[in-house]
């Protein structure tokens, strides 16, 4: 994205809290974005325990940072309204964490259960999930979206796959046209750096 993008959009303040927070619903809160300028990252007391486990590092920290940064970007330059028209009737607010919506969300066109909460969380989940996922991991999400008949054959119509692909296409276009950013190149860089962190082979003096 370049230094000018970083200077303009990167959060000016990071706030780190030792423990995670919990909402009244019992759902864990991993972070927040505030006013286009600040990101609060929670649970940093547990970072040493999770930093060498890619799955936990993704779920609790890296995806959270990227998710909240999407909110920062959206607060600065709004995303296309067509995104919300892909699955307009399938957002369920706080019910996303109930057992009814905890599985099968891919077939409804969502990449995570949390995506079902509301439109702005959906776009943040699509972008953050995509850029931390290897091609194989992303394809696994799409595979879960495939609807099959009783014989295990894929149905002719695949609304979940179509919706996820459409949302990703909108996100890629939004970042490219608004900021000149190629999300595929971002993903390559994120995965490379994450591999360095997990392996313990990172150098903060060379981030080119």
Feature-to-residue mapping (PLM):
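Zn2+-dependent metallopeptidase catalytic core
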Residues: 1-17
């Amino acid at each position: 994205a370049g230094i000018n993008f970083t200077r303009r959009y990167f959060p000016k303040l990071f706030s780190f809290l030792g423990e995670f927070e919990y909402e009244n619903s019992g759902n864990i809160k991993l972070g927040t974005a505030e006013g286009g300028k600040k990101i609060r990252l929670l649970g940093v007391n547990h970072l040493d325990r999770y930093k060498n486990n890619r799955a936990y590092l993704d779920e609790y920290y890296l995806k959270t940072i990227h998710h909240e940064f999407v909110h920062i970007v959206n607060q600065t330059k709004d995303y296309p309204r067509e995104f919300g028209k892909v699955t307009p009737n399938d957002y369920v607010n706080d019910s996303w964490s109930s057992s009814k919506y905890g599985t099968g969300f891919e077939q409804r066109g969502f990449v995570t259960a949390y995506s079902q909460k509301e439109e702005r969380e959906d776009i943040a989940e699509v972008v953050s999930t995509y850029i931390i996922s290897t091609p194989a991991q992303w394809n696994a999400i799409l595979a879960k979206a495939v609807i099959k008949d009783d014989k295990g054959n894929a149905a002719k119509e695949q609304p979940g796959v179509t919706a996820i692909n459409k949302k990703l296409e909108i996100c890629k276009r939004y970042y490219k046209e608004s900021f000149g950013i190629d999300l595929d190149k971002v993903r390559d860089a994120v995965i490379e750096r994450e591999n360095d962190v997990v392996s313990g082979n990172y150098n903060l003096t060379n981030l080119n």
